């Protein structure tokens, strides 16, 4: 289980000087899907990861050191909160720079063991999410895994949840509002970063 967490630093792009001795978990998804809120819920801290009032405005890569415990043994992992995709109203040139920085970071940051792709459970087949999934698969290494996490599932009824789970069998459904699915997600994160989820 996660017992504590703290903010470490922010980056604009990949920095080889910021190495990590720990496995890392990257949270990706389109703007306003709930990345920061999910990190806060998992770490049981309301304001650990800051949510921007303007979707897509925050374009920093934020790092958090997370201390976990499994069978009385403590260990560290890093959570990485990535900028949201596809929302920011900025110049085309600036957006291209952001995309290039993210592309370089995701491909070169070898300590990332788990990519958590957050998808709004009410909009499951948006082109931006399909493209993001295909993009990650193109450079995924054998020691890395993609996990689809459907957010805001408190907006769905039981039938809709069952249908979604049936269509995406290896996914997790979560709700920050009522904490649904968070324990299962926490277990997967810990097992994957420890190399136990093969």
UniProtKB/Swiss-Prot annotation:
Binding residues annotated for GTP, in chain numbering: 29-36, 56-60, 81-84, 151-154, 174-176
Any one of the GO BP annotations: division septum assembly
InterPro entries reported in the protein's UniProt record: G_ENGB_dom, GTP-bd, GTP-bd_ribosome_bio_YsxC, P-loop_NTPase, Small_GTP-bd
GO MF terms held by the record: GTP binding; metal ion binding
Entry keywords, A to Z: Cell cycle, Cell division, GTP-binding, Magnesium, Metal-binding, Nucleotide-binding, Septation
Protein origin, superkingdom: Bacteria
Binding site for Mg(2+): 36, 58
Needed cofactors: Mg(2+)
The keyword Transferase is annotated on this UniProt entry: no
GO CC annotation, single: cytosol
One Pfam family cited in the UniProt record for this chain: MMR_HSR1
Residues covered by the EngB-type G domain: 21-195
Presence of the UniProt keyword Transmembrane helix in the record: no
PROSITE patterns per the UniProt record, alphabetical: G_ENGB (PS51706)
Function per UniProt: Necessary for normal cell division and for the maintenance of normal septation.
Family: Belongs to the TRAFAC class TrmE-Era-EngA-EngB-Septin-like GTPase superfamily. EngB GTPase family.
Matches recorded under NCBIfam families: GTPase_YsxC (TIGR03598), small_GTP (TIGR00231)
Name of the featured protein: Probable GTP-binding protein EngB
Source organism of this protein record: Campylobacter jejuni subsp. jejuni serotype O:2 (strain ATCC 700819 / NCTC 11168)
Lineage: Bacteria, Pseudomonadati, Campylobacterota, Epsilonproteobacteria, Campylobacterales
């Amino acid at each position: 289980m996660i017992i504590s967490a703290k903010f470490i630093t922010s980056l604009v792009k990949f920095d080889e000087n910021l190495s990590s001795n720990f496995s890392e978990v990257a949270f990706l998804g389109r703007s306003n899907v709930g990345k920061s809120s999910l990190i806060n819920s998992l770490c049981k801290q309301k304001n650990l990861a800051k949510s921007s009032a303007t979707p897509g405005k925050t374009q920093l890569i934020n790092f958090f050191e997370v201390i976990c415990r499994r069978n009385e043994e403590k260990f560290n992992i890093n959570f990485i909160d990535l900028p949201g995709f596809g929302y920011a109203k900025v110049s085309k040139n600036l957006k291209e720079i952001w995309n290039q920085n993210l592309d370089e970071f995701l491909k070169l940051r070898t300590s990332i063991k788990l990519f958590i792709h957050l998808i709004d459970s009410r909009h499951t087949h948006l082109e931006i999410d399909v493209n993001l999934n295909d993009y990650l698969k193109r450079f995924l290494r054998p020691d890395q895994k993609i996990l689809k996490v459907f957010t805001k599932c408190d907006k769905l009824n039981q039938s809709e949840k069952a249908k979604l789970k049936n269509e995406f069998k290896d996914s997790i459904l979560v709700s920050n509002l009522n904490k649904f699915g968070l324990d299962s997600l926490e277990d997967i994160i810990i097992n994957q970063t420890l190399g136990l989820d093969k």
